[in-house]
Curated annotation (Swiss-Prot):
Disulfide bonds: 1-10, 18-27, 58-62, 164-194, 187-239, 204-209, 240-245
Protein's gene: GP
Name assigned to this protein: Envelope glycoprotein
Pfam families in alphabetical order: Hanta_Gc_C, Hanta_Gc_N
InterPro entries named in the record: Gc_C_bunya, Hanta_Gc_N
GO cellular component, one term: host cell Golgi membrane
Length: 275
């Protein structure tokens, strides 16, 4: 979303796509990611435990020992070719047997033995459906390059001036202070003097700020959630906008009382922080 003076517009921009208005053009270019369209993602347990990225997962001409060599498919079991040769082995007064000269280690066993050499990824808040898998990447390994082109006829003097008035109240807080767990600060934000306002709401104490989120405010009351990390046992976290903060702040819990994975992580982890 962009807001220039009274002009405001939003668009979901994909790779190599642009948001174009009369005054500005914003393009998403050169998206860098650890994932490629042809990659295969392998989960060895629950989705929350993450998975491995395979660049060369066999699908058609599989040899025994390749990743994905023996797989169940909608048309039956996929059986790989054997990379080797058979020869007859005979001994006196016994039935001849066939001896295989080649690889006898399956792709799964070979993968398990060398899984640390594959690139891995973490998964947070997964959502799976019949046709898609969505999750949040806690590693922040995705890098998007944004190119902004501004028209020459744009009046920069008026961009910082807005009639919008914002009042803030700190409603509640979840999580803990410190850098291990993180907290979720819930703010009640009142907007007057204009119908919509795109701006940033921050979570701060008297010393500094620990997190922010972009909010598209509407006239009246708005509820804004801010995720942050930091602070200490005496920090009173307040909701702030620009240089204005709520009149009161709230104290978060101690880190050893909350899970180390954070308030918004998987609840199945029972690891606790000692503070």
């Amino acid at each position: 979303c962009i807001q220039l003076g009274t002009e405001q517009t939003c668009k979901s921009v994909d790779s190599n796509d642009c948001l174009v208005t009369t005054s500005v053009k914003v393009c998403l270019i050169g998206t860098v990611s650890k994932f490629q369209p042809s990659d295969t993602l392998l989960f060895l347990g629950p989705l929350e435990q993450g998975g491995l990225i395979f660049k060369q997962w066999c699908t058609t001409t599989c040899q025994f020992g390749d990743p994905g060599d023996i797989m169940s498919t909608p048309v039956g079991m996929k059986c790989p070719e054997l990379s080797g040769s058979f020869r007859k082995k005979c001994a006196f007064a016994t039935t001849p047997v066939c001896q295989f000269d080649g690889n006898t280690i399956s792709g799964y066993k070979r993968m398990i033995a060398t899984k640390d050499s594959f690139q891995s990824f973490n998964v947070t808040e997964p959502h799976i459906s019949a046709s898609s898998l969505e999750w949040i990447d806690p590693d922040s390994s995705l890098r998007d390059h944004i190119n902004v082109i501004v028209g020459r006829d744009l009046s920069f003097q008026d961009l910082s001036e807005t009639p919008c008035q914002v009042d803030l109240t700190t409603t509640s807080i979840d999580g803990a202070w410190g850098s291990g767990v993180g907290f979720n600060l819930i703010c009640s934000v009142s907007l007057t003097e204009c119908s919509t306002f795109l701006t940033s709401i921050k979570a701060c104490d008297s010393a500094m700020c620990y997190g922010s989120t972009t909010a598209n405010l509407l006239r009246g009351q708005n509820t804004v959630h801010i995720v942050g990390k930091g602070g200490h046992s005496g920090s009173k976290f307040m909701c702030c906008h620009d240089t204005k903060c709520s009149s009161t702040g709230l104290i978060a819990a101690a880190p050893h009382l909350d899970r180390v994975t954070g308030y918004n992580q998987a609840d199945s982890d029972k690891i606790f922080d000692d503070g």
